Amino acid sequence: MRRLAKKYELLSETGRVNVPDLMLQNGGSMELEARNARHQFFADCARTYRCSRVLLAHHADDQAETVLFNLLRGSYGLKGMHFSTTHQVNGKELQLLRPLLKTTREDINNYLAAHKIAFRDDASNAEGITTRNRLRLEAIPLLNDILGREIRPAILKAAVASQAQQQAIASILESMQLYDPQGRLFLPKIAKLSPALRSSAIHSYLKAHGVSNITQELLARCNSLITDPAIAKINLPAGRFLRRREKRIFIS
């Protein structure tokens, strides 16, 4: 990478981190700890060069793999990456942009070949050591072979349709005024919703309060706060709770 950067007269920054050590220290998966380490590296680089945004090279093939990966983990809907996301790293905001999300790997390779631009692949992407890599290297090629066609375009189309549906549902929920003045869910109103709308309302509330990895199973447990009077508290990730008290549902 350094040689390529020098060839094109570009600045380069490299970093090294022991992901297995981070897994032992923090208890996270390999994917989670590697992602957190990357975000920390990006934040350090942004601070060094006084940048407010960092551009990433995720492309359409990566997006399809992400949607499939999240679906198999039990995500709520067909969840993929967003063009722009903001993360908190050591108490400071880091904005990540993905301008190539609608561009396929094939299109990128064709562009590089047409312009005779040398590039470097990340060698770790060819190793079947993570779930995502195995999806890319084993599962997706097998599905392509079974169906006799490339499956990524179909996954991407389904994800776009799902996102449009979620946006429409969000508009409907916003008009229903489901929150009290303190921003808590008002139980008498949310209890009247259909199960599908109620799950969407809870999902929106959790997401707005920074809850990650919102699965179907988690939403089902959160719904029990509304349907089962005997339940008053649900465990959330990162040591937080969703509680029901005085006809209000809120995070603590």
Please provide the spans of the model-predicted regions.
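Core alpha/beta nucleotide-donor-binding catalytic domains of modification enzymes
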Residues: 1-137
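AMP-forming adenylation/ATP pyrophosphatase catalytic core
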Residues: 17-19, 37-38, 85-93, 137, ...
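Non-catalytic, surface-exposed connector residues within folded enzymatic/regulatory domains
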Residues: 24, 129, 149-152, 213-216
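Active-site catalytic microenvironments for nucleophilic, acid-base chemistry
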Residues: 48, 74, 142, 205-208
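Internal, active-site/partner-interface "lid" segment
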Residues: 125-133, 153-163
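Inter-helical turn/loop segments and adjacent helix faces that build the functional surface
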Residues: 142-154
